[in-house]
């Protein structure tokens, strides 16, 4: 995740990067990444005070996927601006929850996450109604794991720290 953000910022010159977790328990993950990356890498000079020749890091933003789908996903799909995103999703609900309604809800969350990644990549052509046309070819990374556990969360945090 971290190295991809460096690539997108420095070499593709994309100024922002979105983090979209499809798990309410990860609601603070985008804010954590903002604090980590933007405070550390949001400077215009290096440690010796020399002006940087390349951008240091992107603007990091995001929200839980279910909220994001109804607010800014249309912009991600249809805007003239391109913003890469990471879509984060556990494929199974938390252990110990045997309620079928919970399992069905979580399955729909995972399906939505995969569908968003697919739509960003492939688009949804609709030339008859241009306001509904999705071009596709929008950069996104779908990061999935089995269940959200402390171990899985640690791995996710480690992926975010690779370039720091």
Residue ranges and their predicted role:
Residues 1-162:
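A SIS-like phosphosugar-recognition module
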């Amino acid at each position: 995740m971290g190295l991809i953000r460096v690539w997108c910022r420095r070499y593709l010159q994309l100024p922002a990067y979105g983090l979209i977790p499809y798990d309410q328990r990860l609601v603070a993950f985008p804010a954590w990444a903002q604090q980590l990356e933007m405070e550390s890498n949001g400077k215009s000079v290096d440690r010796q005070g020399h002006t940087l020749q390349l951008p240091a890091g992107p603007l990091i933003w995001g929200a839980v996927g279910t909220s994001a789908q109804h607010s800014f996903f249309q912009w991600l799909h249809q805007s003239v601006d391109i913003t890469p995103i990471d879509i984060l999703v556990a494929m199974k609900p938390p252990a110990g929850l045997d309620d079928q309604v919970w399992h069905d809800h979580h399955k729909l969350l995972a399906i939505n996450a995969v569908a968003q990644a697919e739509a960003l990549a492939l688009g949804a052509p609709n030339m008859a109604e241009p306001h509904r046309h999705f071009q596709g070819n929008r950069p996104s990374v779908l990061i999935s794991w089995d269940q959200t556990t402390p171990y899985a969360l640690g791995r996710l945090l480690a992926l975010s720290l690779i370039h720091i």
